[in-house]
């Protein structure tokens, strides 16, 4: 039902990074916002989001569990390779950054391709652009942190927040079992984890970052599971 897409050409990577660049440029026209810590962001939104998405969940069928497992793998790939970009940025290892970003591209393609069997090629393309915007905002925050630019951190945080809302709108329109507010809350918390991780890596607080990684991983599992459950409810015959 799901397939992984390998980024075999430099053209795919260039197109993705061009979209990332557009997202980064868009940061400059967004209103400034204070940079909330990931913990504050997570505490504010996660309880409500999870209660809406997971409330009264029925036992999953085998096909739903398989879908959830595939989506978990994709989302863990996302956080793994974005973390590598962050690590190598602080290490100033350009060759390693290039490889990690190639994997970010391939992973984003796979996540976007996962919805094509349900919503079509146009949805795949639209979702890929939104994922590029997400990474663009994370990368902007990373570079701002590396450069010690608090103002750029704030604008990148606003971009990450705006992109989370765009993705929530997109998914909620596609699937009525993915309510906008719940998805928005989940994505805000996810963005908060990226922010916290970047700050901890910059400060070399590796013990704390190890805890953040575990929280981050468990949280993307929740995103994957909520998506699988929603697909199973919307496309009953595909999951029966």
Regions found by a protein language model. Name each.
Residues 121-155:
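Mid-length scaffold segments of soluble, non-membrane domains
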Residues 50, 54, 60-97, 101-104, ...:
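C-terminal amphipathic alpha-helix
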Residues 46, 82, 138:
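Alpha-helical and His/Cys-centered functional microenvironments
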Residues 1-15, 22-31, 37:
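N-terminal secretory signal peptides
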Residues 9, 32-62:
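C-terminal segment of N-terminal export signals and the immediately downstream linker at the start
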Residues 106-115, 131:
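A glycine-rich, hydrophobic loop/mini-helix early in the fold
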């Amino acid at each position: 039902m799901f397939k992984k897409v390998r980024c075999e050409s430099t053209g795919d990577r260039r197109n993705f990074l061009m979209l990332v660049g557009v997202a980064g440029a868009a940061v400059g026209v967004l209103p400034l916002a204070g940079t909330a810590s990931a913990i504050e962001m997570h505490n504010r939104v996660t309880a409500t989001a999870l209660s809406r998405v997971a409330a009264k969940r029925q036992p999953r069928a085998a096909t739903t569990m398989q879908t959830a497992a595939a989506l978990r793998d994709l989302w863990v790939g996302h956080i793994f390779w974005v973390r590598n970009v962050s690590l190598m940025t602080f290490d100033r290892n350009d060759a390693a950054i290039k490889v990690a970003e190639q994997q970010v591209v391939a992973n984003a393609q796979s996540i976007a391709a996962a919805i094509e069997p349900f919503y079509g090629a146009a949805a795949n393309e639209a979702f890929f652009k939104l994922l590029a915007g997400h990474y663009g905002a994370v990368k902007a925050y990373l570079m701002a942190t590396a450069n010690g630019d608090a103002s750029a951190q704030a604008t990148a945080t606003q971009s990450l927040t705006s992109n989370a809302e765009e993705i929530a709108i997109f998914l909620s329109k596609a699937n009525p079992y993915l309510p906008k507010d719940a998805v928005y809350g989940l994505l805000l918390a996810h963005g908060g984890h990226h922010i916290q991780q970047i700050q901890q890596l910059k400060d070399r607080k590796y013990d704390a970052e190890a805890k953040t990684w575990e929280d981050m991983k468990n949280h993307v599992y929740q995103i994957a599971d909520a998506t699988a459950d929603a697909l199973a409810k919307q496309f009953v015959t595909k999951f029966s």
